[in-house]
């Protein structure tokens, strides 16, 4: 339940920020461009990520709805739905490595992807730049997947996790908690 509430809070926070900025632009008669990050789970669903899928689906619906509502004010809204892009934060939580499974998420992501690889951060940045560019003024209300066609070919990203045993889940949970604590300690300034 706590995770579902956190997902809902993230959606509400993002929606409040978007509404605040959008209303200000409308009052000042200024054009604007809002770019959100969602996930392909907004289309496919996926096991084991219900809180994330719920909150990201809310962002996806908000993007489509406000694109229509705010379009007459020259305010554009779009989303990017990235597939597997290896970052330390994501990888340490999605596939906590142990000595037994080093590189398992990379291998799994690459083998199930039609392009046979994971995304590179510059590719994600290039898409964001394109969507924010002045030359892209007519594109609004869209969610663009950048995942090498993975969601089209594989559907639910984490379906294979259904094969894990209780002991595996305990180990994963402990590793994720350690990763979260490490990140939290890095953010704390004393």
Language-model features: where?
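Active-site loop immediately N-terminal to the catalytic Tyr-X3-Lys motif
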Residues: 44-50, 72, 116, 121, ...
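Active-site helix of classical SDR
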Residues: 18, 55, 63
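C-terminal helical subdomain
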Residues: 79, 101-139, 146-148, 173-190
